[in-house]
């Protein structure tokens, strides 16, 4: 029986390669959604996501709960209050060709009796901005939030209030009790250019593109700054709606209704019936793209009939009734001047193309990743080649081809290193893996640096006062060698570093001190054991409950943990067999890092285990997040919408349309008190 990580399909794709693809996508999502600092073009992300979807479709047994295909995006920043979306804000599936549009239409046939080719669609330009939710209570703007990860976003109410085309009060006499408007906030090109001109005059940093400018403006902690930015909203849909009056029964009519009550809607929205009209809209909006005055990157096509939308439903991260048909990414030619080789946390050697600077899709590009030796071979690329780079609203482009007829006579072959460019240890490539790795381990300065950066990262120990530049200084001066050394730093030591004043030094020490109180799962993830990601770390914590049990676990016992196979179990065992690792962990514990052991409570005859539960209304004894966490601890799936598959609706005060729908469907309704009694939390 082959190892799971060694299993491969007929094309030679292995599970390990699939998991590497997932990890790459997770990193790209974090930089795009959380840091507003994308690493790759949208086109490259979309291509990788499409590749992952296709592989998982071919191998459903390889799908894991933490796959990027099973969620929407990334978690919100900690600088803003968090808002839970009552109805998840899902993203859209993408199409990149007419054939993929045909596939989208064809997939509908399994869910509706109507011929998809005869359906009316509401067609909209795909705006390149930031998705937001704006809640009106009794006609007055009450709360606004970013999409975040689709379930939880950031509270940006104060900033949204500063956007001139968003009404603070709806233009109607009898407004709904609650109306959630969903739309895209973006920055028109003229406003973007003026913003950058002012920044240049003041000697300030400019924005790379309008999307980054819009995202940065919305996430200002000071609304006065946001008010000075030329932001605009275009609504594209409705979320929560509570009123005695019924909404229109088509998507197009709902948008026109929003427009009539003062909500801005895009002027290019059209109705189209059938494939040919959909393609005509796509071609038309693409032709208008240069003259619209704002950035778009495709066309959004939505089934117009709301009843059919409900029949079609959703998959894990997107609706079946809508698709984003994206434009081809913009391409330019430039020259490959050199290739540098970078060393990552696990020793992975990554070739980085150094390019003759070229202006592509609004940004000057001079670097591109070449991924690995296989990619260099596939492209047939050599130093001196003229290459085609593709970029779609991002900073780091993708090299998609070589212009062979322009190859110079003095072109130089790219030599993949056999020794680490940092520590000169041997470089090896394990059979079945695309990545070559430095064997130096923590002897390698590059791996130590990346390991420290991982240790302090948000999803690990979350030491936000210790960034990349500080780590580099600490290592250069040999003040820090292991993660445990961070907890031994003193104020006077930090004060001697460049650009480190008394306040900055104290902030760093405060962050380090705060990080001592963590969780077992975070600590395990922070250790950087290869292939032990967030989900695996959480599974280990849930299974063994404490660190001593994990350290003592045998190879066989580790494989009893969910999603831990032979390869991961072997890596965990080897980690604890290395005396240096044990010393570092014990040193960390001695510095005061602590957590509460995971306690698993088994409840006999648990009536909630495996049930689908929806929360609605205002809870008085628990917050919404507390109730959700409590339900999940009982093994429930907490959903944002009521359907025939819902087992329980927990109704707080002022429960609205969800309660009505639950009663119509015969879903069992619990009051907050009944719910608390059922869980034994009173």
Curated annotation (Swiss-Prot):
The entry's keywords: DNA damage, DNA repair, DNA replication, Ligase, Magnesium, Manganese, Metal-binding, NAD, Zinc
BRCT domain segment(s): 603-682
HAMAP family assigned: DNA_ligase_A
GO molecular function: DNA binding; DNA ligase (NAD+) activity; metal ion binding
Record family assignment: Belongs to the NAD-dependent DNA ligase family. LigA subfamily.
PANTHER family with a match to the protein in the record: CHROMOSOME TRANSMISSION FIDELITY FACTOR 18, DNA LIGASE
GO-annotated cellular components: cytosol
Annotated residues for binding of NAD(+): 42-46, 91-92, 124, 147, 184, 302, 326
Enzyme class, UniProt record, top EC level: ligase
Protein name, per record: DNA ligase
InterPro entries: BRCT_dom, BRCT_dom_sf, DisA/LigA_HHH, DNA_ligase, DNA_ligase_AS, DNA_ligase_CS, DNAligase_adenylation, DNAligase_N
Named cofactor requirement(s): Mg(2+); Mn(2+)
Top-level division of the source organism's lineage: Bacteria
Keyword Cell cycle in annotation: no
Active site per database record: 126 (n6-amp-lysine intermediate)
Gene Ontology biological-process annotations: DNA repair; DNA replication
Presence of the UniProt keyword Manganese in the record: yes
Pfam families: BRCT (PF00533), DNA_ligase_aden (PF01653), DNA_ligase_OB (PF03120), DNA_ligase_ZBD (PF03119), HHH_2 (PF12826), HHH_5 (PF14520), Nlig-Ia (PF22745)
Function summary: DNA ligase that catalyzes the formation of phosphodiester linkages between 5'-phosphoryl and 3'-hydroxyl groups in double-stranded DNA using NAD as a coenzyme and as the energy source for the reaction. It is essential for DNA replication and repair of damaged DNA.
Organism of origin: Actinobacillus pleuropneumoniae serotype 7 (strain AP76)
UniProt xrefs under CDD domains: BRCT_DNA_ligase_like (cd17748), LIGANc (cd00114)
Gene name tied to this protein: ligA
Chain sites annotated for binding Zn(2+): 420, 423, 438, 444
Enzyme nomenclature, EC number: 6.5.1.2
């Amino acid at each position: 029986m082959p190892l799971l990580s060694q299993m491969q399909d007929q094309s030679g794709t292995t599970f390990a390669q699939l998991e590497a693809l997932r990890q790459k996508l997770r990193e790209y999502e974090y930089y795009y959604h959380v840091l507003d600092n994308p690493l790759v073009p949208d086109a490259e992300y979309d291509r990788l996501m499409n590749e992952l979807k296709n592989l998982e479709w071919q191998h459903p047994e390889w799908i894991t709960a933490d796959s990027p295909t099973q969620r929407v995006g990334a978690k919100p920043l900690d600088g803003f209050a968090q808002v839970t979306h009552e109805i998840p804000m899902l993203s859209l599936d993408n199409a990149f060709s007419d054939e993929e549009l045909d596939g989208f239409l064809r997939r509908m046939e399994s869910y509706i009796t109507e011929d998809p080719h005869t359906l009316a669609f509401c067609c909209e330009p795909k705006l390149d901005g930031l998705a937001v939710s704006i809640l009106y209570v009794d006609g007055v703007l009450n709360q606004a939030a970013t999409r975040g990860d689709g379930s939880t976003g950031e509270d940006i109410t104060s900033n949204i209030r500063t956007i001139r085309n968003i009404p603070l009060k709806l233009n109607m006499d009898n407004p709904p009790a609650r109306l959630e408007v969903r739309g895209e906030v973006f920055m028109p090109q003229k406003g973007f250019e003026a913003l950058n001109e002012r920044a240049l005059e003041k000697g300030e940093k400019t924005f790379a593109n309008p999307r980054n400018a819009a995202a940065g403006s919305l996430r200002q902690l000071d609304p006065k700054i946001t008010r000075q930015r030329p932001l605009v909203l275009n609504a594209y849909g409705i979320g929560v709606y509570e009123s005695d009056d019924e909404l229109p029964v088509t998507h197009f009519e709902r948008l026109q209704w929003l427009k009539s009550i003062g909500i801005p809607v895009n002027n290019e929205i059209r109705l189209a019936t059938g494939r040919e009209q959909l393609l005509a809209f796509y071609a038309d909006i693409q032709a208008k793209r240069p003259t619209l005055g704002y950035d778009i990157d495709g066309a959004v096509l939505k089934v117009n009939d709301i009843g059919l939308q409900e029949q079609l439903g959703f998959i894990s991260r997107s609706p079946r009734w809508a698709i984003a048909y994206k434009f081809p990414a913009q391409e330019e030619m430039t020259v490959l001047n050199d290739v540098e080789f970078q060393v990552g946390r696990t020793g992975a050697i990554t070739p980085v193309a150094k390019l003759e600077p070229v202006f592509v899709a609004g940004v000057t590009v001079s670097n591109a990743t070449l991924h690995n030796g296989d990619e260099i071979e596939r492209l047939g690329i050599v130093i001196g080649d003229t290459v085609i780079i593709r970029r779609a609203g991002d900073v780091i482009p993708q090299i998609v081809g070589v212009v062979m007829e322009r190859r110079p006579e003095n072109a130089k072959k790219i030599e993949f290193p056999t020794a680490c460019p940092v520590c000169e240890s041997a470089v090896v490539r394990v059979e079945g893996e695309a990545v070559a790795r430095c064997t130096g381990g923590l002897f390698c300065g590059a791996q130590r640096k990346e390991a420290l950066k991982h240790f302090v990262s948000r999803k690990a120990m979350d030491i936000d006062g210790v960034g990349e530049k500080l780590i580099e200084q600490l290592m250069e001066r040999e003040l820090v060698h292991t993660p445990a050394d961070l907890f031994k730093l003193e104020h006077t030591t930090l004060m001697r570093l460049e650009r480190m004043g008394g306040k900055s030094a104290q902030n760093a020490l405060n962050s380090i001190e705060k990080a001592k109180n963590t969780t077992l799962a975070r600590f395990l993830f922070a250790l950087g054991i290869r292939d032990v990601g967030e989900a695996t770390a959480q599974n280990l914590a849930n299974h063994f409950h404490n660190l001593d049990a994990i350290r003592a676990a045998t190879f066989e016992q580790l494989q009893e943990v969910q999603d831990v196979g032979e390869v991961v179990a072997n890596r965990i065992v080897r980690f604890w067999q290395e005396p240096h690792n044990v010393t570092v962990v014990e040193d960390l514990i001695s510095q005061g890092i602590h957590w509460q052991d995971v306690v698993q409570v088994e409840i006999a005859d648990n009536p909630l285990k495996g049930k689908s539960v929806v929360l609605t209304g205002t809870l008085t004894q628990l917050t919404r997040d507390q109730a959700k966490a409590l339900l999940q601890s009982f093994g429930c799936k907490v959903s944002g919408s009521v359907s025939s598959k819902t087992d329980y609706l927990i109704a707080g005060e002022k429960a609205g349309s969800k309660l009505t729908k639950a009663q119509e469907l015969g879903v069992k309704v619990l009051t907050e008190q009944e719910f608390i009694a059922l869980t034994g939390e009173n």
